[in-house]
Amino acid sequence: MKKIQIHKVIFTIILYGIGFTMLTPLLWMISTSFKPENEVFQFPIRWIPEHSVGFDNYKEVWGEQYNFGMYYLNSIKVTVISTALQILVSALGAYGFTKIKWKGRDQLFLIYLATMMIPPQVMIVSRFVIMQKMGLYNTHMGIILMTMFSLYGLFLLRQAMMGIPDSLCESAKIDGAGHLRIFFQIVFPLIKPSIATLAVLKFVWTWNDYQTPLIFLSNRMLFTIQLGMKLFASESGSIYSLTMAAAVSATLPLILLFLCGQRYIIEGIASGAVKG
């Protein structure tokens, strides 16, 4: 019994050590955002600033000079719309692959699922050409259209819908309900946990996406927060206290989302390989 307890204690200490190591950069980032520039690289590190500047760094970052607020709003716009559309599209697709019987349904789904093995980088050139020909290059609509479809979202919601008895849908059909009514009034409410999982994961993926806006946006007025951070680091002249204040501002929505939805993130990761 004692050996088991000692083993658990050692294991717990190791986990806490790993967790603290992973949190150290985040804590340093938050601490640095409240420091004057001359205290940023002091050694040993002062986790609590000796001469705190309060929120002055944040006020400067969010001032009109750097347009940080515009990048923030652009990210919110793209992320929220893309997440909402992906939930709707994935849910409708999953319903079609589970509750509507048609020839070749399962075979087509396997082919569809097999495309997950294709790296997204392979399709960048073709996407670029398509966006240009459609007149959607350098627009938020183009970014949203490219990020609103997800094989993982379809797979996740299909697995959830497979757990819903077909008898519920059949009973609704007998009462005169059509597919849309069955979907929105019966199926959709029953898969809310999976929808929440997809919403949290999709929000994180889109908010952190750097590659897609980098390739398909050239107008600074349309830049998302990730491109804005890169531009800000160049314009601020490597003033690390300001850069860390900007980084904290960019990370804050994800931190809050993780604290509120960590259960759904864990469920999503446990349900299969995560791929955006």
Language-model regions, residue ranges each:
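A structural signal for multi-pass alpha-helical bundles of membrane permease subunits
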Residues: 2-276
